[in-house]
Amino acid sequence: MSKSKDDAPHELESQFILRLPPEYASTVRRAVQSGHVNLKDRLSIELHPDGRHGIVRVDRVPLAAKLVDLPRVMESLKTIDKKTFYKTADVCQMLVSTVDGDLYPPVEEPVATADPKASKKKDKDKEKKFVWNHGITLPLKNVRKRRFRKTAKKKYIESPDVEKEVKRLLSTDAEAVSTRWEIIAEDETKETENQGLDISSPGMSGHRQGHDSLEHDELREIFNDLSSSSEDEDETQHQDEEDINIIDTEEDLERQLQDKLNESDEQHQENEGTNQLVMGIQKQIDNMKGKLQETQDRAKRQEDLIMKVENLALKNRFQAVLDELKQKEDREKEQLSSLQEELESLLEK
């Protein structure tokens, strides 16, 4: 059939959600599902003239009801064959019924006020009493406050001092006979920063030179002691022989000092190498401890899982995995013990 132009559009039904206490809700649900003809006798809704309060009777038991506005609009659908759904209404209100409520609440008489702002504010406060902050499901608790928060307004900050300073600068620029400007490139700033960093390097070199000078002073003292002792022993000999002996002792001392310096450098390098080895082995030990702890935790979880499983085939499979974890744990323990022995041997040296 073709729809004629004169046909009026289908109007949606007017619907709302009825929320009852649990014991009464189960009674109404069973009555609706059973399809009783006398459902009107068992359930009745009566609204007061204010349109917000009313009485809901379930099996002749009166319940106080209040009509509230939901935070959002929901669509109500119906179906005949459970395959195709048709929209029947937009639901935006809910009738909340309680046992301990007031069946006949006092009616608020309107007070005539000359100020329109005051009356407007009073109407707004009255509407807030019938605003429902929650949704229909539990995750939508306080949804009105969470999703409809008031946005922060940008406040205009008055700064008369800044405006006066800007005006003064503009007036001085206009009165100036000539102007001069200077451009500072980024490369120059980087060079100055590098120079500031290079200034600290002479201090480091001076520290090293001071350390070397202390070593040379000690060597000079040793040299002076040895030379003085050699002079005391050779007092009876001739002056020429003394000069020759002094020259020989100086050369020998220089060789000895050079050998000592070389030995100290080699010892320092060996110590540095040993420290690096110790740090590397310590790092390996820490990593191995972490792996061992992780393997032990996995084995513990596997044991708990085997205790809970009743299927024999599944339990055998889990047991095979547990055996592999135990073998892995033994290997990691051996590696950890070997690393600890190696570390102890290095520390003893």
UniProtKB/Swiss-Prot annotation:
Residues 244-349 form a coiled coil. CDD domains: TAF7. It is found in: Nucleus. InterPro entries: TAF7, TAFII55_prot_cons_reg. It comes from the Eukaryota. The modification Phosphoserine is found at S171, S200, S201, S213, S264. GO terms for biological process: regulation of transcription by RNA polymerase II; RNA polymerase II preinitiation complex assembly. Phosphorylated by CIITA. Phosphorylation at Ser-264 by TAF1 in early G1 phase disrupts binding to TAF1. Ubiquitinated by TRIM26; leading to proteasomal degradation. Component of the TFIID basal transcription factor complex, composed of TATA-box-binding protein TBP, and a number of TBP-associated factors (TAFs), including TAF1, TAF2, TAF3, TAF4, TAF5, TAF6, TAF7, TAF8, TAF9, TAF10, TAF11, TAF12 and TAF13. Part of a TFIID-containing RNA polymerase II pre-initiation complex that is composed of TBP and at least GTF2A1, GTF2A2, GTF2E1, GTF2E2, GTF2F1, GTF2H2, GTF2H3, GTF2H4, GTF2H5, GTF2B, TCEA1, ERCC2, ERCC3, TAF1, TAF2, TAF3, TAF4, TAF5, TAF6, TAF7, TAF8, TAF9, TAF10, TAF11, TAF12 and TAF13. Interacts with TAF1; the interaction is direct. Keywords: Coiled coil, Nucleus, Phosphoprotein, Transcription, Transcription regulation, Ubl conjugation. Pfam families: TAFII55_N. Residues 107-126, 185-212, 227-247 are annotated as: Disordered. The TFIID basal transcription factor complex plays a major role in the initiation of RNA polymerase II (Pol II)-dependent transcription. TFIID recognizes and binds promoters with or without a TATA box via its subunit TBP, a TATA-box-binding protein, and promotes assembly of the pre-initiation complex (PIC). The TFIID complex consists of TBP and TBP-associated factors (TAFs), including TAF1, TAF2, TAF3, TAF4, TAF5, TAF6, TAF7, TAF8, TAF9, TAF10, TAF11, TAF12 and TAF13. TAF7 forms a promoter DNA binding subcomplex of TFIID, together with TAF1 and TAF2. This is Transcription initiation factor TFIID subunit 7. Belongs to the TAF7 family.
